């Protein structure tokens, strides 16, 4: 029997049949299925680990990364004690906005992936907005 992605996500809550990695993959695909980056509005993709956060602006039509930034960058490491804080994510969002504006990218589509729009993800988005990007 084949189920749709939404049905599988509901089954996760009821039966606990899906493994966590499969659930995360389904959730990522359900969010990404609605979002496509174009030449006019590329996609800002976010990856969060326990220690750091990474973001890249991607043009999906040519499948190329236009701008990349992470909390491992030297400027951000010097200004914050570690990459786990919301302040580091906010600084990274501002730096990402500066780099993208240099490449004439002002309008983007935000792809939060499987993560909730909360905490470090929200701080990154707020920093990018403060830097001049439009979502």
Swiss-Prot record:
One of the record's GO cellular component terms: chloroplast
Keywords: Chloroplast, Plastid, Ribonucleoprotein, Ribosomal protein, RNA-binding, rRNA-binding
InterPro entries, alphabetized: Ribosomal_uL18_bac-type (IPR004389), Ribosomal_uL18_bac/euk (IPR005484)
The keyword Cell division is annotated on this UniProt entry: no
Pfam family, one: Ribosomal_L18p
Localisation per UniProt entry: Plastid, Chloroplast
Gene3D superfamilies per UniProt: 3.30.420.100
Top-level taxon: Eukaryota
Function: Binds 5S rRNA, forms part of the central protuberance of the 50S subunit.
Protein family membership: Belongs to the universal ribosomal protein uL18 family.
Protein name: Large ribosomal subunit protein uL18c
Species annotation: Thalassiosira pseudonana (Marine diatom)
Species lineage: Eukaryota, Sar, Stramenopiles, Ochrophyta, Bacillariophyta
